[in-house]
Amino acid sequence: MKVSFCIPTYNRVKFIEDLLESINNQSSHSLIVEVCISDNASTDGTEESINIWRDRFNFPILYQRHNENIGPDRNYLSAVNMGTGDYCWIFGSDDILTKNSLALME
């Protein structure tokens, strides 16, 4: 089973790394994970950080940066539309996945 973590963001680079760490640190599960980040024209270096994190984490990170702010509702839809998983789990960019959450999903 594949799970898409759909994350809309805007100028939250300081928080996204903690969220990605919490996803990466999940254990005892056999789920396929992808992360889909829709960036609402951030100006805080989010795109540069995403490029570094792609090499660091054990799951694909799909990233789309909008050239202008499209509003929160369209940014959420953009993140969801990127996902290819059987399930979509929408996370705020400042959320943290609790330990063993993916194992409990199975």
Locate each region found by the language model.
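Nucleotide-sugar donor-binding/catalytic module of glycosyltransferases
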Residues: 1-106
